[in-house]
A protein has these predicted regions:
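ATP-dependent adenylation/nucleotidyltransferase module used to activate substrates
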Residues: 1-152, 162, 171-172, 178, ...
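AMP-forming adenylation/ATP pyrophosphatase catalytic core
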Residues: 13, 120-127, 132-385, 391-392
Length: 392
């Protein structure tokens, strides 16, 4: 009897082709469309269009489609932490948390309730199982590789997951969809954070976090202007500072270099590679190891953003924290970002950046930049929710 595989059908071309390939491999395939966010009146969230597209794919492939809402779980496990991190001066990545908590957390459990032996998605990554060991490997299409977003998914969950697109390039995926007559073959890829869509990020965040004005200063303490809240700015930011044209300074862009949480001050500098923007060392906590290091030091690569290249580095490892020394400085690294570690194509795991030392700071500065785990803020509006739905 063929194995039942539950495919997360998002409404996009990637998940549609994942389902197609599994059908061609002889599996019993069921589609599962999950909703994590409510459609808003302005139409920024594409939930309704995504569901309609998932319906059309399921009909074309002749597979059942189930629908479920994880809005409550997303609200509590992802979005509330996202807001708390920004309120605490961090720069989080909710997509990493969503993969750990929702897509390969509660959704994987739901797939098992549907009788699925595995959960498959349209992620560009590879899972290799050999010798009793599971390895998470980069996709063949390096430009589309999504291992960075999967770094926090536990090995036990990944062992029950299939990534059918791991050996394919994006162009090949679209061509497969076109030849199979899938109605989403030319549907544009989704971009940005899922619950924000194409709306201005500042306006979205301002709907939940109240302004908290403070000074914009140079590293020497000269006041240049006012910001409306540290939460609305991130390290390396250039736009929206409104501090240009200052007498005594060159006509050059200003960049956010640091946040002084104690004084609610935003520190800005001139120069794209100003020393205060270049991280020479940083600390990572909230670790998830997919391949546990054998010793207390490790030479590997580190990736701190999606689609950024690996930077060779040395790790000094203890039970709860990793100190990272990159072989070359990393620009605009913010507390709250995720760092993923790689040995060649294999993702070893990763964690959250909790402290940063730059080329212009003394060694003890890394302690000063370390932030406590964020507390959830008081919200200006309630968080979205949606009731669960069943099979369609």
């Amino acid at each position: 009897m063929p194995a039942r595989v539950i495919v997360g059908l998002s409404g996009g071309v990637d998940s549609a082709v994942a389902a197609l390939l599994l059908l061609r491999a002889g599996h019993e395939v069921h589609g599962l469309h999950m909703s994590n966010w409510e459609e808003d009146e302005a139409g920024y969230c594409s939930a309704a269009a995504d569901l309609q597209a998932a319906h059309s794919v399921a009909r074309e492939l002749g597979i059942p489609l189930h629908r479920v809402s994880f809005a409550a779980e997303y609200r509590e496990r992802v979005f509330a932490d996202f807001l708390a991190a920004y309120a605490a001066g961090r720069t989080p990545n909710p997509d990493v948390l969503c993969n750990r908590e929702v897509k390969f957390g509660v959704c994987l459990k739901y797939a098992r309730r549907l009788g699925g032996e595995r959960l498959a998605t349209g992620h560009y990554a590879r899972v290799e199982r050999a010798g009793g060991r599971m390895r998470l490997l980069r996709a063949r299409d390096r430009a589309k590789d999504q291992c960075y977003f999967l770094q926090q998914v536990p090995a036990a969950a990944l062992a029950a997951v299939e990534f059918p697109l791991g050996e394919l390039a994006k162009g090949e995926v679209r061509e497969l969809a076109r030849r199979a007559g899938l109605p989403v073959h030319d549907r544009p890829d989704s971009t940005g954070i899922c619950f924000i869509g194409e709306r201005p990020f500042r306006a979205f965040l301002g709907g939940y976090l109240a302004p908290r004005p403070g000074p914009i200063e140079t590293p020497a303490g000269e006041r240049l202007g006012l910001h409306d809240g540290l939460a609305f700015h991130t390290i390396g930011q250039r736009q929206g500072l409104k501090v240009g044209g200052r007498a005594g300074y060159p006509e050059a862009p200003w960049y956010v270099a640091a946040k002084d949480l104690a004084r609610n001050a935003l520190i800005v500098v001139q120069g794209h590679e100003h020393p205060l923007l270049m991280a020479s060392a940083f600390e990572v906590e909230d670790l998830c190891w997919l391949a546990a290091p054998a010793g207390t030091t490790l030479d590997c690569g580190v990736q701190v953003r999606h689609r950024s290249g690996d930077v060779p580095c040395r790790l000094e490892i203890d039970a709860t924290r990793v100190s990272v020394t990159p072989h070359r400085p990393i620009r605009a690294l913010a507390v709250g970002q995720y760092a993923a570690f790689f040995a060649g194509p294999e993702c070893l795991g990763g964690g959250v950046v909790t402290g940063v030392r730059t080329a212009a700071q003394p060694a003890e500065a890394i302690l000063a930049t370390r932030t406590r785990p964020p507390r959830r803020p008081r919200l200006r509006q309630s968080l979205p929710d949606r009731d669960r739905s069943g099979p369609l």
